[in-house]
């Protein structure tokens, strides 16, 4: 059973699709998109956009977490590409103001080229602890 005092700060990495132009808003120099040649549509004629996918996953997670009784606060813009430091600063400022028990969850997917770079493995979960005491850091990393 979820504690209604627990706040989940939800992050979705990279930018999304502009609702008016349908343009992918992660800067071209960063990439974060791949054209797939496997016949699947994905987001735009075979393109897979990390930031758009991350927002779809974050939205679904928020829906399910709210059903479980968690208070969810998205810290990402619906489509603009804000820096990770901006998103964590937002969560830290809100958490300091309200002083509640919280968790920061960041959703990321990688755009891997099926036709040009076949994948032979998968990535797992990473835990990062920032500005916490040793006991808390050890607990989070265990």
Feature locations, PLM:
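Active-site-proximal helix/loop segments of hydrolytic enzymes
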Residues: 3-8, 43-142
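Short glycine-rich His-centered loop
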Residues: 5-47
